[in-house]
């Protein structure tokens, strides 16, 4: 229901969970590629075994305390971390940027702000964010909104 007073809180929780999930998968991806560079002769079976081990380790470090479930290999499910390497962490940055922009746009004229932001041109992401929303790329807006949503 678009009129629900809980709508914004639920959207914040969804954004936070989505970010946490992709960050977990990204950590597995980075660790898998580090392992592959250290083990260039690894077989597909060894890669599968290591993926399950690393995914379970990342899960136990960051997700089990929140979810109350240990030893899940769920974060190893993204097979494209092997055939399209080292890009998953870019999703996390994109989600952080999206949330920052959404927060910045609240209470402003959407059309005017979008025109202003788009007219900034081609800049490095950090410089563009400073010009677009007035701050560096940061998870702080999401963390503040999450803290508020959990109250």
Residue ranges with predicted function:
Residues 1-34, 38:
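Acidic/histidine-rich catalytic neighborhood
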Residues 26, 30-151:
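C-terminal, non-catalytic "cap/extension" segments appended to globular domains
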């Amino acid at each position: 229901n678009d009129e629900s007073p809980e709508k914004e809180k639920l959207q914040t929780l969804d954004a936070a969970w989505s970010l946490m999930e992709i960050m977990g998968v990204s950590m597995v991806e980075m660790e898998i590629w580090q392992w592959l560079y250290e083990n260039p002769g690894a077989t597909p079976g060894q890669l599968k075994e290591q993926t399950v081990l690393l995914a379970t380790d990342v899960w136990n470090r960051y997700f089990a305390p929140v979810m109350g479930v240990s030893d899940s290999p769920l974060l190893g499910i993204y097979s494209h971390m092997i055939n399209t390497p080292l890009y998953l962490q870019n999703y996390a940055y994109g989600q952080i940027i999206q949330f920052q922009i959404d927060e910045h746009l609240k209470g402003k004229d959407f059309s005017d702000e979008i025109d202003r932001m788009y007219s900034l041109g081609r800049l490095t992401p950090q410089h563009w964010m400073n010009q677009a929303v007035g701050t560096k790329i940061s998870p702080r807006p999401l963390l503040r909104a999450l803290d508020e949503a959990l109250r």
